[in-house]
Amino acid sequence: RALIINSRDGMDEASIYSQTDVLEIKNNSIDSYSINPKDFGIRGNSIEEIKTNSERSSLDIIYTVINNIDSDARKISLLNAALLVMLFKEISLRDALSECNDALENYLVRDKFNQYIDFTNQVSKDVK
């Protein structure tokens, strides 16, 4: 099973600013559909909010998302993560959005990210 995604605003991921066209490959067939973020109550403010030009600003965006701060970065991350959950769990996008939203609201994403940081720091120490 796979998704090929192209947002109408030119991003190579699902967008919160415009519709996203999807080709879903499943069981030797291809379904074509569009996702309108407004249908799921998702509205972006400005694409400029998610643009980044440095490692520091990228990290700031990551921390905004994992700390569950309402932002365009959180919304677009939620939508794209939900598409993956939908794909692998074979559930509806609405249900996947709910699962991903719960993970953000309960800080499970932040906790997992911090575990990853701890792990990589330990590996780095072990290698030295």
Each PLM stretch: what is its role?
Residues 1-128:
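Glycine-rich anion-binding loops and their surrounding alpha/beta cores
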